[in-house]
Amino acid sequence: LMIAEELNKICNDVGINLIFKSSFDKANRSSINSDRGIKLDDALKIFEKIKTNFNLPILTDVHNEDQCNQLNQDSIIDIIQIPAFLCRQTDLLLAAGNTNKIINVKKGQFLSPTDVKNIFTKIETTNNKNIMITERGTSFGYNTLVNDFKGLDIMKRYEYPVIFDATHSVQQPGGLGDKSGGQREHIPSLCKAAISIGVA
């Protein structure tokens, strides 16, 4: 709640629309000893308070079909996010699509820009065309991600909103052994490059 309040204040001050994003379960942590989060039921209670207090649209990740089915029953979550590692999981994409909510798919680090067409096609079979795709870097050897900015142009051709995730683009997966590292000093430059191309 404190984070939502502060972000809401900052965005109101500068005139930016805010979508509040929070993961209730970080299911793909590097180490079994890392904190993961809370149960979806508990998270929904917190999300409801955020929506009531600040009137913000809310985005959260899902990791299985049961979570999609549970979110299908509520009006709290506005946008369902598919994690990058799960972006090709057909049953998960279909379950998310069947909620008729907005779906944001994180493009897998292993996918080419043209591969996202298959993601769109899967979700479209549910008659849900409220889809967004997020670029978050491409694997480049071990523990390193890079950005090919031609990919943003290519993905825009499919006429769905393209988002650029600068923070995950500078991630170094597993770079610290039992957790990921990162190079945050490059975030401003990558954001400028993405803005120059034009993203959602």
Per-region residue spans from a language model:
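A short alpha/beta connector and helix-capping loop motif
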Residues: 4, 68-85, 90-97, 173-200
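Catalytic beta/alpha-barrel core
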Residues: 37-39, 53-68, 77-91, 101-113, ...
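Acidic (Asp/Glu)-rich catalytic clusters
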Residues: 8-15, 51-53, 72-75, 94-99, ...
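Glycine-rich, proline-tolerant flexible connector loops at the mouths of alpha/beta enzymes
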Residues: 1, 18-40
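Residue-level marker for buried hydrophobic side chains located in beta-strands
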Residues: 18, 58, 162-163
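N-terminal glycine-rich anion-binding loops that anchor highly charged ligand groups
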Residues: 11-23, 200
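Generic structural signal for well-ordered alpha-helices
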Residues: 4-8, 43-48, 68, 93, ...
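Catalytic alpha/beta core domains of metabolic enzymes, predominantly
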Residues: 99-200
